[in-house]
Swiss-Prot record:
Belongs to the guanylate kinase family. The gene is gmk. It is found in: Cytoplasm. It comes from Salmonella paratyphi A (strain ATCC 9150 / SARB42). SMART domains: GuKc. One of its GO terms (molecular function) is ATP binding. Its EC number is 2.7.4.8. ATP binds at residues 11-18. This is Guanylate kinase. It catalyses: GMP + ATP = GDP + ADP.
Length: 207
């Protein structure tokens, strides 16, 4: 069976990364593509399901996993830990399923060190003006928070060149088409096609 591909997807807040990934998944069968499910120490929110939205663990369990080097990457955010399990990712990839990991540039660097075969995609907004409009469109942040998010966005975008692919999300449908094209091209790589069609190739080359 052909090994699945791990896709690292990063973008500044407001670039439309999550919307693009969710739209992509709606066009792909579950046996082809999944989103990575992270471990976290924070409490479940209403409606969240263990194993579907996150793997919820306590701090001691999480620290034990860190000690076992069980994570491809992990970080602390506002007192809670979040991490991507190497075992979970590898088990899914071994079934031939592609996995999407929505993560920032720092987490992406950690994963590249441990899984250099992963493919990475960076998504940019079409302009700072449009990014500002999208951030304001949420209608829930103060001017101070928006200014902070814009500064964080610029810092995040400065790492775009570290990625394999670059998508500019100006028109959503075009950006989604670009994302699909990347996935299709990766699935046609020699290494994957050779595994997928091994029996056929053997028959074609038999004396």
């Amino acid at each position: 069976m052909a090994q699945g591909t791990l896709y690292i997807v990063s973008a500044p807040s407001g670039a439309g990364k999550s919307s693009l990934i969710q739209a992509l998944l709606k066009t792909q069968p579950l046996y082809d593509t999944q989103v990575s499910v992270s471990h976290t120490t924070r409490a479940p929110r209403p409606g969240e399901v263990h194993g579907e939205h996150y793997f919820f663990v306590n701090h001691d369990e999480f620290k034990t996993m860190i000690g076992r080097e069980a994570f491809l990457e992990h970080a602390e955010v506002f007192g809670n830990y979040y991490g991507t399990s190497r075992e979970t990712i590898e088990q899914v990839l071994a079934t031939g399923v592609d996995v999407f990991l929505d993560i920032d540039w720092q987490g992406a660097q950690q994963i590249r060190e441990k899984m250099p075969q992963a493919r990475s995609i960076f998504i940019l907004p079409p302009s700072k003006i449009e990014l500002d409009r999208r951030l304001r469109g949420r209608g829930q942040d103060s001017e101070e928070v928006i200014a902070k998010r814009m500064a964080q966005a610029v810092a995040e975008m400065s790492h775009y060149a570290e990625y394999d692919y670059l998508i500019v999300n100006d028109d959503f449908d075009t950006a989604l088409s670009d994302l699909k094209t990347i996935i299709r091209a990766e699935r046609l790589r020699m290494s994957r096609q050779k595994q997928r069609h091994d029996a056929l190739i053997s028959k074609l080359l038999a004396d």
